[in-house]
Amino acid sequence: METILRYVIIAAVGALASILANQSIAVFNDGLRPVLPEYLEKRMDRKALAATSFAIGFGLVIGYGLPTSIAASIILIHCILLTTDIIGTWCPDTKKGMIASGVIGAVYGVALLFGLQVIIDLFNLLPVNFLGSLGQVSAGITLAFAIFPAVTVALQFGAAKGIITAVVTLLVRQIVETYGKIALDAEHTISLNKDGMALLAGMIIMLVFAAMDKEGNDQNSNEMLTQIFADKVARIRKYMPVLALMGGLIAAGTSMSIMAGDPISQGLLAEGDRVNAGLTALARAIGFIPLVATTAITTGVYAPAGMTFVFVIGLLIPNPFIALIAGAACICVEILLLNVIAKGLDKFPGIKRCGDNIRTAMSYVIDIALLIGGILAAQAIMPTTGLFIIVAFWCINKCSKKPLVSMAVGPLGAILVGLIANVLFLLSLYTPAA
């Protein structure tokens, strides 16, 4: 009976997470979440979104998630949710596409639980296995996203204030990187996420400048205030029941030792040390609050595991049915708190004028982050030659009558480099470095 329940839970997690990604409600990849508004607001087509999702997620699945899962015999959540991001975005944004994504996600979840090693072995058959290198594509997105408030300030209030915001953002990041570990006791520490804290600092400064914007203080402006952040959270709140179910399923799966949220708690859970695994997961979740909350508020897209407290619940509650209920309640509380934060942000004068600049700044940042990530991945696959191909791809795309959107060039270029590397290897024209 327990074995059947395990397969039911993993299938449900895979199916629902794929559907959430397909409908652009929630994605797990922190690097993909800021990209989704580009698709939702029609600045990116479905093909470019699918290619970006694959490029920034699949390498992490193969190079990080699967090997770690095999070592512990417990699935690292990245294996499931990074792949469901890809499944969801690759299926059409239609009713049939939604159903297809759910079916494929369920099958993938069951297959993942059934045999992890087979998947890795298949990709190891490639002459040049470049999938691990594709993880470089998303290496800078989370970091780069932290600078978008500074770009917004520069666009709206001038370069000088933008520089001030950028400098403070950088200082906060470095301070957290240096002093961001808070010891709970001799064995446990809370490690604050430096990029999340930097993003939070930048947003606070952006809101301070917006509050000081006199043009936004008149009565008519306030009456016509566009609820930018509240509208984003309202979109998340609309889907709160299905997000709650998603959180509950993840908590139940963690409770049954099917999955874990990070390698440290995964290892402790494999050893049967649920309490320390829970404390470790709690410390990680606290550190990631700013990153998940701020990206949710600014994009209108949530994470399937929320702020990751559902893993703590699953680890500390051994009964999967109770964990299911508690996990669902946890996600509801998180979303309600997001709404409170968003309504508070909307009261700041000047936010209305920030709207277009926020969107423009996010596009700027993601464009350059994905291009640099593509270059890093290409260089990892084929040093120097990879850079040549990416630059050529970028320039030729610019000259095309129907160019690809800029943010798709880096990820697609990295995939192209990987394919070219394998073809050249078969033609005896390329030998990868040892």
What are these regions (language model features)?
Residues 304-308:
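Conserved structured catalytic cores and adjacent interaction surfaces
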Residues 55-90:
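Glycine-rich, N-terminal phosphate-binding loop and its surrounding beta-alpha-beta segment
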Residues 1-53, 79-299, 312-434:
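Signature of multi-pass transmembrane helix bundles
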